[in-house]
Amino acid sequence: MPDKPNLLALDFDGVLCDGLLEYFQTAWRTYLEVWSPPESTPPDDLPPRFYRTRPVIETGWEMPLLIRALILGWAESQILSDWHSISRQLLEQEHLSPEVLGSRLDQIRDQWIATDLPGWLALHRFYPGVCDRLRVILEQDMIQLRIITTKEERFVRSLLGQQGIILDPGIIFGKGHQTA
């Protein structure tokens, strides 16, 4: 009989933690700064449309661009079937780059965390039972745990730390991760 697996790699975003509320709020704040719309409050129908189309997003910089596409009237079905082309088209039309959008989004998130960490953390919800199960895995020390995320490691550490879960270095693989 083969040995039992001893490595467990888990996706943080959308598997361990539901961050949709924070994703939208950070994307909306970025949208406000990049496009300066006349209204600072999003249309009522925008958050649910964003949540439904969010699965097309591979990297954070795309989130404010997704809001832009929705505001400009792109149909959800088009976004879901051809996001790559739409995003490239919008970048070109708006004279933007992934680096500029990503940097702005990270700065906005950083500022929010620095000035209102409890408010930022409150927009993330761990799925039921996840934190208890992580504690069991860590206490048993029989499985090597790895957490993979599109977020920067420090954001994941903040969220887990709020739940009393402190992970050793090298367990979280996120945006900007560097190996020793």
Describe the predicted segments one by one.
Residues M1, E39-T41, Q178:
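Generic structural signal for short, solvent-exposed loop/turn connectors between secondary structure elements
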Residues P2-A9:
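Extreme N-terminal starter segment of soluble prokaryotic enzymes
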Residues F12:
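Residue immediately C-terminal to the conserved phosphorylatable aspartate in receiver
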Residues V15-R157:
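Alpha-helical substrate-recognition element adjacent to the catalytic core
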Residues R146-A180:
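Substrate-recognition "cap/lid" segment bordering the active-site pocket of phosphatases
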